[in-house]
Curated annotation (Swiss-Prot):
Originating organism: Ananas comosus (Pineapple)
A Pfam family reported for this protein in Swiss-Prot or TrEMBL: Sod_Cu
Major place of residence: cytoplasm
Record-annotated disulphide pairs: C56-C145
Domain of life: Eukaryota
SUPFAM superfamilies with a match to the protein in the record: Cu,Zn superoxide dismutase-like
Top-rank EC class of the record's enzyme: oxidoreductase
This protein's name: Superoxide dismutase [Cu-Zn]
One term under GO cellular component: cytoplasm
Gene: SOD1
Length: 152
């Protein structure tokens, strides 16, 4: 089993820890919790770069090794890093539990060393008709991020 972790933080007080586990060539399970967010839906993605030198802005675009358009997690054609939305409760916290087969922890398309990002707004899953729908899901600014690192 391969395990990874990302510790999320931001200047706005958003914080959390996200865990990634993968058995063999099976899907990757994403679990953890994030606090300090405004209630509602927030886009949740793996971005291409593990670079936070300029905060979450330097994490690059969504992880997209196949060069696809943005989509929903259940879409066959999507960015590998498109994990959809997380639903934040009235207390500002969310418990994450996602199983996804496009974000492996090993091999040429591994997400180790990349970043997980929480956005300010809902991800329209590529279906909103906005000019940004097919690239970012029009999910707004980046409110928190963390680099995905290998865990022992």
């Amino acid at each position: 089993m391969v395990k990874a972790v990302a510790v999320l933080g931001s200047s706005e007080g958003v914080k959390g820890t996200i865990y990634f586990t993968q058995e063999g060539d099976g899907p990757t399970t994403v679990t953890g919790s994030i606090s300090g967010l405004k209630p509602g839906l927030h886009g949740f993605h793996v971005h291409a770069l593990g670079d936070t030198t300029n905060g979450c802005m330097s994490t690059g675009p969504h992880f997209n090794p196949a060069g696809n358009e943005h989509g929903a997690p259940e879409d066959e054609t999507r960015h590998a890093g498109d994990l959809g939305n997380v639903t934040v409760g009235e207390d500002g916290t969310v418990n994450v539990n996602i199983v996804d087969s496009q974000i492996p922890l090993s091999g040429s398309n591994s997400i180790i060393g990349r970043a997980v990002v929480v956005h300010a707004d809902p991800d329209d899953l590529g279906k909103g008709g906005h000019e940004l729908s097919k690239t970012t899901g029009n999910a707004g600014g980046r409110v928190a991020c963390g680099i995905i690192g290998l865990q022992g």
